[in-house]
Amino acid sequence: YENTIYELNRKYEQDVKSMAFFHIPMSEFSTAFQLYTQGSPQVQYLFGAIGEPDDAISYPHKEDTMFEKMVEVGSTQAVFVGHDHLNNIGLKYQGIDLVYGRSIDYLAYPGIKKVKGHRGATLITLQKDGVYSIQPIVYHE
């Protein structure tokens, strides 16, 4: 990650902006949500909610420095994830938007077809100058 970003910065003679897309959330999604629920000024609420039972955020429980490197390098503006099908929250933490995309499935959990409000899409609009917006779109049947 770091080498690629620095190589792109050199190639284009400017600091490139990036976004990351993963299936499984990073542990910082949980950290940011916990800080948000405690009212910490370190986290800015963007939209949505955690819908999984017990406010679950499923992430690998092993040491990882990817997020710290993203903050240090300063290129990554947003990280988009899925996995937890009932979560659809967006939070800004340490300058990076942490965003759960909406689910599109009917098969993830028993009875999920009866659950309303979690299906849809996340529209990312990116301008030529690097400015972007994120809009959650709820699918209504």
Where in this protein do the model-derived segments appear?
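His/acidic metal-ligating clusters that form di-metal
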Residues: 1-82
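Binuclear metal-dependent phosphoesterase catalytic core
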Residues: 65-73, 87-141
